[in-house]
Amino acid sequence: MSKTEENFFEYLNFFEKSNINNRAFFIDKCNTFYSDDFVLKYAYNLDKNFFPFRDDLFSFKDSAFLLNENIKAYISNMSFLHKEFQSNNLLGNFSFSFFENDIIFMLPEIFLSFCILFSICFFVILGNSKKFKFPFLSYSCGLFFFYSFFLTFFLIFNSLNLDTFCFFFHFNNNFFTNLVKLFLIFSSFFCILFSLDYMKKDNLEIFEFFFIFSLSILGMFFLISSFSFVSFYLAIELQSLSLYILASLKKNSNFSTEAGLKYFILGSLASCILLFGISLIYGFSGIIFFDDLAHLNIVLFNFVEYSFFNGLILGLLLLSVGLFFKIGAAPFHVWIPDVYEGVPLLVTAIFAIIPKIVIINFILLFFSSFFSSFFFFWHKWFIFLSFFSFIVGTFGALYQIKIKRLLAYSAISHVGFLCLGLSLNTVEGFQSVFFYILIYVLLSILFFTIIFCLKRYNNNTRIYNILDLQNLFKVNPFFSLIFCLTLFSIAGIPPLMGFFSKFFIFLASIKESFYFISLFSLFLSVVSSFYYIRLIKLIFFEKNSSWIFLTPFSKNFSLILIFLTFLNLFFFFISCFFFRNSL
């Protein structure tokens, strides 16, 4: 190896160990000597170890990378740049501290991890203490995590506008990721309230539920902040393993055990497919960081053979299959109806609300920011998923008689709208997706609050069959009216909250001339209104020989119903008020 090459690799190895500010300074210094934009991008890519064959770079004389004269000039003059840095003693000004920034910027995750570890030690020891007569701790544990989430919410809110990389560029916290975390914690508050009331009324003492649920939330925090395939896979597996345990929460129930086993087997298969896709992307590019992959797609698009991009596309396809399995997009939906029906109602609420927040926003961030140059591929792939999800979700729900299976197919149909918005690759499309998932989660919380309230007074059993809703209006008119408004909103009837989420998706797709899929989704949205209207017909107009008397609602559920119903009814006026004040 020549002296020039030795200086080049010495300089390169140094900057691989430096932080992001040093990298920016390095690019700025290159700009002083070289004006060619491609050379600068190549230098930026190379200094972050883009290629697995970096050490053999100079042996590829016939490669398209080295045929470029600008790159040859860059390599030949690297020694001059290296001497310039040495003469000005610029290398000695750089420092890197692992704990200086990482703990501060990852404080919400670290705090939540500490709360989980502390609660496991404290509640397990106290719950098995003979001195305290083996106390029941589920309610106390639930309150502990409720306040822990409350403090975590303010820790995230305090760092909302920060934009930084943590743990050697494996995590990235910015405004978008922190906003998703805030919404995730907000939804978790309702799940904790659901669990406290559910365990109290059903006489359950499963305080382990709160540990596992908090672990899944922690995994979702890491998932939305992940900036490399390593952190991404570890985070999504932490979330998935926690959800596998939650699916089998009722150990004495055969339905819960069967649902947990189905979810575990199919979820493990999806994780294998996802890992295989990651390995293909890494094998063809040698890249684990997302921003490196984005730069590679942009900078080297015209300098590699088609087999390289075919490998990336195959890896991207397998990775998206694993992700869309997690949210239940058709045709990867086969686990949703059986799992939703078999798991306890509390776990069904978690499956329907929590994972979709993080995974949909991660897909939005990943494909729009790092794989935007592959729009020609994932645009068609998302349209196919949207088309298939509309069909399966709409027609699969028409003949369902159980509420949880009806909800499962309805969730598949909603994923179709999200895929339609993701396929647009426009700012309006991505904004409509984020707004849709926001409204979907709020309506899901409202719907599950209603389902939790449907409990018979005489035998203390829950209502899971839609035929049992007959004559409900005669028993509780106000509650039936709230139920009716919620169903209309989910169906997309104006001027309720659910209408605007679908309206913005349609508006963004028509703006991009997606006329056929827009009309098709609009038609199936009208068809899907049938099974919501059927529920309303049973509640208001069907006569039943027996009367359904419900148990009194808890104070927490009553407040949730009032608040979310008010938001559902007056969402248009509230949004107009805030928009006018922001101008």
Language model features: what each stretch is:
Residues S2-K17, R23, N31, K41-Y42, ...:
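Alpha-helical transmembrane segments of multi-pass membrane proteins predominantly involved
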